Structures are given as structure tokens and as C-alpha cells.
UniProtKB/Swiss-Prot annotation:
<dbReference type="InterPro" id="IPR031310">
    <property type="entry name" value="Ribosomal_uL5_N"/>
</dbReference>
<keyword id="KW-0694">RNA-binding</keyword>
<comment type="subunit">
    <text>Part of the 50S ribosomal subunit; part of the 5S rRNA/L5/L18/L25 subcomplex. Contacts the 5S rRNA and the P site tRNA. Forms a bridge to the 30S subunit in the 70S ribosome.</text>
</comment>
<keyword id="KW-0699">rRNA-binding</keyword>
<comment type="function">
    <text>This is one of the proteins that bind and probably mediate the attachment of the 5S RNA into the large ribosomal subunit, where it forms part of the central protuberance. In the 70S ribosome it contacts protein S13 of the 30S subunit (bridge B1b), connecting the 2 subunits; this bridge is implicated in subunit movement. Contacts the P site tRNA; the 5S rRNA and some of its associated proteins might help stabilize positioning of ribosome-bound tRNAs.</text>
</comment>
<dbReference type="GO" id="GO:0000049">
    <property type="term" value="F:tRNA binding"/>
</dbReference>
<dbReference type="GO" id="GO:0006412">
    <property type="term" value="P:translation"/>
</dbReference>
<dbReference type="InterPro" id="IPR002132">
    <property type="entry name" value="Ribosomal_uL5"/>
</dbReference>
<dbReference type="GO" id="GO:0005840">
    <property type="term" value="C:ribosome"/>
</dbReference>
<comment type="similarity">
    <text>Belongs to the universal ribosomal protein uL5 family.</text>
</comment>
<keyword id="KW-0820">tRNA-binding</keyword>
<protein>
    <recommendedName>
        <fullName>Large ribosomal subunit protein uL5</fullName>
    </recommendedName>
</protein>
<dbReference type="InterPro" id="IPR022803">
    <property type="entry name" value="Ribosomal_uL5_dom_sf"/>
</dbReference>
<dbReference type="InterPro" id="IPR020930">
    <property type="entry name" value="Ribosomal_uL5_bac-type"/>
</dbReference>
<keyword id="KW-0687">Ribonucleoprotein</keyword>
<dbReference type="Pfam" id="PF00673">
    <property type="entry name" value="Ribosomal_L5_C"/>
</dbReference>
<dbReference type="InterPro" id="IPR020929">
    <property type="entry name" value="Ribosomal_uL5_CS"/>
</dbReference>
């Protein structure tokens, strides 16, 4: 079992129960899933770019990504409905906790000119979204084999009812928020 999951069970639940005066352990917010999304708009011209992006996402997450397709045609972007334009992975359970641990302890500190993540990126329901400009911050990506640097979106979905609860949950994991 991931260390972070044990830490959540042993420490974070107690901390949040006292902070928010919950009556039941089931009211304590928890991390439900982590979604990684990589939009590859350039895949219209070259299908190999999408395969490389999917391989990078598979290396980062340890799970085969789902190829996302365009929902509708947009002439300005020269895309048609059904064109493959990105890939995504939804992590739950053990893989989610392992990825979350690597994200906090290894990947985020490797971001260039890192001064902390914005605490304002919550959606109003306790879910946190962040963007990464370079996939090379993850140790699983070999810098020499990267065809081009691309970013990805990371969404941490929680069971929190409000942004304050979600912020407290992530802060309990020592999430590197900007001061």
C-alpha cells in the first residue's frame, strides 16, 4: 500500500475531523480520482505525435491512456468530428495514491522556477486542477527519447463539499501551495 494512503488513514482523517467537527469518518473528504489529460492538437497533421503523447502518458501513469476524439467539427482548427486529438488517463485506487505521492514529492519540485502552486485553482466543489508545461518533470520520462516537450492537465477529484475542505485535504498532504 502507498505510504500516502497510510498517512491519510492514520493522520489526515483525525486532523480534518477535528478541524471541521465532522460527526462521522465518512464525512471526511478523500481523494477520489486523479485525471491526467494531454491535448495534442498537432495530431491532425501527424498521427505519430499522438502515439508518442500516449506513450509518455502511459509511462507517467502506469496505465494505458484512452484516445480522446473531437466532439464536433471546427473549421477554424481544421478538425472534424471524431478526429483523435488527445489522450487521457483516470487513476483510482492504489495507482492513484502512488501517482499522487510521486507528484508531490518528486515531480512538482522539479518544475523550473517553482514557487508553489496556486491555491485558487479549485472549482467550487473541492476539486483541484493544475497544468504542467513539460512532461519531463516526471522521472519516468527519459529526456533523450522525448520527441517534443508537451504539457498535461492534472485534475485531483475529491469528495470535499467546498473549496476550503479540499484545500485543507491537500494541505494535509503537504501539497506545495504558494504562500
Amino acid at each position: 500500500m502507498a505510504k500516502l494512503h497510510d498517512y491519510y488513514k492514520d493522520e489526515v482523517i483525525k486532523q480534518l475531523m477535528s478541524q471541521f467537527d465532522y460527526n462521522s469518518v465518512m464525512q471526511v473528504p478523500r481523494v477520489e480520482k486523479i485525471t491526467l489529460n494531454m491535448g495534442v492538437g498537432e495530431a491532425i497533421a501527424d498521427k505519430k505525435l499522438l502515439d508518442n503523447a500516449a506513450a509518455d502518458l502511459a509511462a507517467i501513469s502506469g496505465q494505458k491512456p484512452l484516445i480522446t476524439k473531437a466532439r464536433k467539427s471546427v473549421a477554424g482548427f481544421k478538425i472534424r468530428q471524431g478526429y483523435p486529438i488527445g489522450c487521457k488517463v483516470t487513476l483510482r485506487g492504489e495507482r492513484m495514491w502512488e501517482f499522487f505521492e510521486r507528484l508531490i514529492s518528486i515531480a512538482v519540485p522539479r518544475i523550473r522556477d517553482f514557487r508553489g502552486l496556486s491555491a485558487k485553482s479549485f472549482d467550487g466543489r473541492g476539486n483541484y486542477s493544475m497544468g504542467v508545461r513539460e512532461q519531463i518533470i516526471f522521472p519516468e520520462i527519459d529526456y533523450d527519447k522525448v520527441d517534443r516537450v508537451r504539457g498535461l492537465d492534472i485534475t485531483i477529484t475529491t469528495t470535499a463539499k467546498s473549496d476550503d475542505e479540499g484545500r485543507a485535504l491537500l494541505a494535509a498532504f503537504n501539497f506545495p501551495f504558494r504562500k
